Amino acid sequence: MERFVLCIHWERRAEQQQPVPQGLVYAQDIYTQLKEYSTNCTSTFPACSLTGNPGIRKWFFALQSLYGFSQFCSSDWEDLCPAVTTDDSEEPVQTALDECLDALQFPDGEDDNSRDSISQTNLFEEAAELLHQLSDKLPAPGRALVDVLLFPSEAPKLKDCLSAIGAIKHLKEWHTAKITIVSKDCKGWQKIGKFLSANVVVSDCPRQLIDPQELWRGTIEIKERKFTSEVEFPEFCLRSVSDDKVPYFENNGDDKNKTVLSEVFHYYGASLEYVQMVALSEIPSYFVSDSVFELSITRNGLQGKSKLMLDQLCSLTEKVGAIFMLPCNVCSLPNPPALQRSSKKWREYMSRKPKDIKVPGVELKGEYCSYYFLIQGKGSGLCKATLLHSASQISGAASLLLLHQRLNNNHPVNMAESTSDILDSLPHFNGEQIALREQILARAQVLAVKEYLKRQEAQPHASVSQSNNLGRLLALTREHVIGDCESRLDSVSYKNMQNITVSTPAFPESEAMISNPADWPERNVLQNLENFEKIKQRLRASILSGSAEQLLGRKDGLKEGMTLLDAKELLKYFTPQGLAVGELQPLQVQRGDNAFLVTPKLTPRKLKGLPFEKAAECHYHGLEYCLDNRKALDRDVAFSELQSRLIRYETQTTCTRECCPIPFALSPIPSPAVLSEPGSVPDGESIQTELRGDPLRLKRRSKDIEGLYPSKRLAKSGSSDSLVSLASEGSGHQQPTRLRTERTASSVSGAQPSSTRVRTAPSVPAQSKPSSHLELEQKESRSQKHNRMLKEVVSKTLQKHSIGVEHPCYAACNQRLFEISKFFLKDLKTSRGLLDEMKKAASNNAKQVIQWELDKLKKN
């Protein structure tokens, strides 16, 4: 990771003007030190991908100074890497320190009166703006280690420097900067240091404030999958050690190998994720690399859970270790600075006054890789982190390493020595061993023959080729016993082979069952590769289902695997009407290897009698769901209501009367997304159809409509069929009556008559209306209106194609074209441009329908 160092100097101008302020002297020493580091301390983590090697570590410097009423800030981060100059005539570039001294000693045309008129608050606000501009020029997260060194002469008032402290807080929270305050007045800076999580020190040697060996800073994260909880331990760092060896796959002496892979950009994760505890005897030697790092906390005086976590890791012995994973993104091109963590987003976020400051996530382009570290105690309060090769890195490298070692160790020898070596490598027998082997072979063949005869007696109708089978059995038994004896020559002496008993006849096929599969290196490689693919699938699924996780919470890791069907394969199981073809069989879903362990001797009856504390410790099916204080049930109910509202208001089409069935009684208030589109408010006829089947819901609905939303909704839905026709806004007792009216044939031709319910207008005094009788305002519903419009469009389209009412095919063409056009219009969600869509659908299908009906008429 690249190192970015920001020095901040705040000091009042003294009466006796100093040539160089003390804070700038410290900054100058640090600048000189960083120049040395940019040449010597450029090492970083090894490559974790075949895409390329990480580039050398660069060092950057910036300065912000507030001296009296004069102020200076670097416009950009200065690269301290030694530049290669080709032309001697070029003038050296002025450094940030030189620019700062010039700006403070020779201010730009400001007199004393203008300086005195500037308040301290304005100066700190200007400094905060300049610091925000520097933070916006930092690279994407995971590539930079930021150190902020503050050199104040005395503690200013908090209300004056609050804006500048907020800019430093932005660097701390969203750019994981390490803050160090160097001041003689430690008590005055304790409050600000606690707010910034900074380390307040009194140091006359600023060179000790920057640790050049730090390669990564972040948190240690431990996740618990069962209850989807996680714990973070901040302020950890990985440091390089001086005795670090170069891994075997890196050859610094060969310059040709360095140019094989190009330099790429590595973006490291913000946390070390805990994987598992492991015994060192279980890790194959070729997975362990020679790269060793050091794990420690960044602040020596830090107390709390991070110090306790470090003590626990230091207690790991030489036989046990903890494996942690550091995610990394590898990209051939640099990612731009993250706009999600810019100063503008920071101001917007802090204006909402959050209780806890959360870091916004950033999506980085590139290949997803990971580093694996084996953490063990090192002593003196530190841990060593040994780099482990992942499955993708070790694939083929172990066998290649073994081959190279044997080739390097293979020295040419003369013919006599090679012949003696070959003879020595052959197995050596003596008379006792051969006799003992023949005795074991005889016992094995006797047992095999007995077992063979026993099976033949159980099968009376045996085949004719019994002698051939018996000969093959004896040959296989001899081959197996001799091979077994030769394999035991190196490990077991033949004197101990007398204790070996052969109980059943063995065959060569069973040899694979005797050896331990856990010893195969290929098995470990395949298992690691399979786990790596599972992790990639989980990450991909979590990115695609982000909105669902916000509604339903995080899913269990075992339930994330889904069995997907192709669209064509899925449609085979359903009819065109949407019904199942037959009884569908449940799909076999692969579960994890971890079986659910039920508490022994636990029944539902015993579980009901247990108190809450003991029941929470038990393991039973559905127990976590029942003991969550109804949070899961409330979440399911809330999501079902949301889903029903979306289905009810968003999925309803324009030419259908039937509503989708909903599981809950809905609020009469439509969702805000619906009000943004005219014509998407539900019509009165659909609400009528919904309420007709349930009288209780009708009473509740009418009460809600009259009480909660009296007239505003009906005024907005001008294109829909209202349940209540408002006659006036005057006061009076309303007596709604229900009437049944027959739908006239002129409204919809060819449609069957159906009864509708309307509510009459309320009675009003005689002064407001001359007549006191009830007026029925029967209106046409939206679906009826759309059907009538479509029939008119279809009729006009047929007339354009010379198919009039008197034509014999008119009725059939009219009905068929109406149904086809209605099918094309059913997916429309609004009424905008509906008439044009009707004309388009009818004209596109008119010729085909007319030709079909004419051919049908000719055949008849």
Swiss-Prot record:
Stretches for region Disordered: 671-788
InterPro entries recorded: MTBP, MTBP_C, MTBP_central, MTBP_N
GO biological process, any: protein localization to kinetochore
The keyword Ribosomal protein is annotated on this UniProt entry: no
Source species, domain of life: Eukaryota
Biased composition (Polar residues): 732-758
Amino acid composition bias (Low complexity), ranges on this chain: 717-731
Sequence ranges of Basic and acidic residues compositional bias: 772-788
Pfam family, one: MTBP_C
Cellular component, GO, one term: kinetochore
Record's keyword terms, sorted: Cell cycle, Growth arrest, Ubl conjugation pathway
Entry similarity comment: Belongs to the MTBP family.
Role according to the record: May play a role in mdm2-dependent p53/TP53 homeostasis in unstressed cells. Inhibits autoubiquitination of mdm2, thereby enhancing mdm2 stability. This promotes mdm2-mediated ubiquitination of p53/TP53 and its subsequent degradation.
Protein name: Mdm2-binding protein
Natural source organism: Xenopus laevis
